[in-house]
Amino acid sequence: MTTRAQAPVGVFDSGLGGLSVLRAIRAELPAESLLYLADSRHAPYGEKPPEFIAGRTLRVCEWLVGQGCKALVIACNTATAQAVHLLREQLAVPVIGVEPGLKPAVATSRSRVVGVLATESTLRSDKFARLLGNVSGDCRVLCQPGYGLVPLIERGDTHSPAVLELLRAYLLPMLEAGADTLVLGCTHYPFLQDAIREIAGDRLTLIDTGHAVARHLGRTLAAAHLQATGAAASPRFLSTADVLPLQAMVAALLGEAPMAQRIDIGDTAVPPLASHQ
């Protein structure tokens, strides 16, 4: 096994939502070391111009490659939609993106009405338009931007009256239109599953693509002979903003109490990250 295979996989999101993907990767690929980076200083990406999203995503991913990551998982639907092709052109490591799980939703739906809850940027992207055209078939697809949800989740708020009020506004019209399946089209939204269940009960089957992304990563690493062996180190957690929300979310989601590190990734070259003790 090469030293390169023992290098970490970088997992990147605009904020904390990608922790749902990191959890799935740890379950599927326990030997892989993971470096999680939350660009929380600039979250949420979903309300920013496409040019900013693409440029910022490339800058952060260049930095992760500079830290020695052997592969990257873009655990952010918005960043994937706006930048994944650019990343694959510019970076010399495998890049795995995420996209709304519309294909499994269409296969699952019995009513042939599917809801998609995602950021406005994802829903407006050419990548999503192509996905919709390719897989929707005879399904009616109801697309709803999740305005206001990501900032609440970034603060650790996943079940407050404010969250429930927004979710009711977004989900009740889908239910009234006959939707029986809901695509969680942002990696933040799996944290809302309990709140969604409170509103919809068992009327909606929820589609979360975290484990599909993890399996795709595993296949990609195997094809490139980059699979790690042995016991992985604990994940490292980095943020471009206050680390306390990241630490709190990791504790709640993974049952761990990590010491996250704050970093600065500007528009110009930055020094390498200090070695982790």
Swiss-Prot record:
PROSITE patterns: ASP_GLU_RACEMASE_1, ASP_GLU_RACEMASE_2. One of its GO terms (biological process) is cell wall organization. Keywords: Cell shape, Cell wall biogenesis/degradation, Isomerase, Peptidoglycan synthesis. The active site is at C76 (proton donor/acceptor), C186 (proton donor/acceptor). Pathway: Cell wall biogenesis; peptidoglycan biosynthesis. Substrate binds at D13, S14, Y45, G46, N77, T78, T187, H188. InterPro entries: Asp/Glu/hydantoin_racemase, Asp/Glu_race, Asp/Glu_racemase_AS_1, Asp/Glu_racemase_AS_2, Glu_race. Its EC number is 5.1.1.3. It catalyses: L-glutamate = D-glutamate. GO terms for molecular function: glutamate racemase activity. HAMAP family: Glu_racemase. Belongs to the aspartate/glutamate racemases family. PANTHER family: GLUTAMATE RACEMASE. Provides the (R)-glutamate required for cell wall biosynthesis. This is Glutamate racemase. The lineage of its organism: Bacteria, Pseudomonadati, Pseudomonadota, Betaproteobacteria, Burkholderiales.
